[in-house]
Regions:
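Sec-dependent N-terminal signal peptides
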Residues: 4-15
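Aromatic-Pro/Gly-enriched surface loop or interdomain linker
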Residues: 17-73, 77-80, 170, 178-179, ...
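Short alpha-beta junction capping motif
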Residues: 21, 73-112
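Solvent-exposed loop/turn segments at secondary-structure junctions
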Residues: 26-30, 79-83, 108-112, 133-136, ...
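Extracytoplasmic/secreted envelope proteins and their assembly/folding machinery
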Residues: 36-43, 89, 93, 111, ...
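Surface-exposed patches in mature extracellular/periplasmic domains of secreted proteins
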Residues: 53-61, 104-107, 125-132
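Short, surface-exposed beta-strand/loop micro-motifs that present aromatic residues
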Residues: 64, 155-171
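Acidic, glycine-rich loop-and-strand cores that form catalytic or ligand-binding grooves
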Residues: 116-147
Length: 213
């Protein structure tokens, strides 16, 4: 555990020179590979607008791999089942407690499975709704109502849930908003420009928060 923490802190210390983010390849049958253009587009937007230097191509990492400690931000999405083994649960817990940040974006149909698995990772913590006053919604772009609605799905209000450890947000779950769809190439969903821009700006806020906290 100590060596993993040391490695992670070292990697975070060189963030000014190079940054890399990753997509989580999880088991369970859900389509972890959904939205293939979303992270590259978010990276491009951030590098052009908020002075990040993220590598253009995101990595792909499995939850049980020690490689997860190489990435300050790991993104996951999908429409179906998510399943973590005991080793993966321990590895993900250590990752987040050591300074890493995991973000699951519900692509519709993920909710019941993800809630079950997150409870295994943090059995003594509950997902709590993140208030609109939280810094993640404040800068560099302002979202006074909190997480934006990108795709309607069944019309429920968008919500951002989190797990906090020692007052630090370590896990983010974006529900009923579908940020990742908004990050995709314009022709994939034919979203209006302003909707895509709203999604990308919220994504930029997430990365800005991670790199500065």
């Amino acid at each position: 555990m100590k060596s993993k923490l040391t490695t992670l802190l070292f990697l975070f210390s060189i963030i000014g020179f190079s940054q890399e983010i990753a997509l989580l390849k999880y088991n369970g049958g859900g389509d972890w590979y959904a939205n293939p253009t979303s992270l590259p587009n978010l990276i491009k937007f951030c590098n052009q607008n908020i002075n990040t230097t993220i590598k253009n191509k995101p990595a792909t990492v499995e939850p049980g791999s020690p490689d997860i400690f190489s990435y300050p931000y790991i993104h996951a999405t999908g429409h179906g089942n998510v399943l973590f083994s005991d080793n993966e649960i321990l590895n993900l817990r250590n990752y987040m407690l050591s300074g890493g940040f995991l973000h699951f974006d519900d692509n519709y149909g993920l909710d019941e499975y993800l809630r079950r698995e997150i409870k295994k990772i943090f059995p003594n913590s509950n997902l709590v709704e993140i208030p609109a006053s939280h810094p993640i919604f404040q800068k560099p772009y302002s979202f006074p109502s909190g997480i934006p609605k990108i795709h309607e799905h069944d019309g429920k209000r968008p919500q951002a849930y989190g797990i906090f450890e020692n007052n630090r947000l370590v896990f983010l779950y974006t529900y009923e908003c579908d940020l990742g769809d908004g990050w995709e190439d314009a022709e994939v969903h034919n979203d209006p420009k302003e909707v895509r821009e709203k999604a990308l700006k919220m994504g930029a806020n997430i990365l800005n928060y991670i790199f500065n906290n």
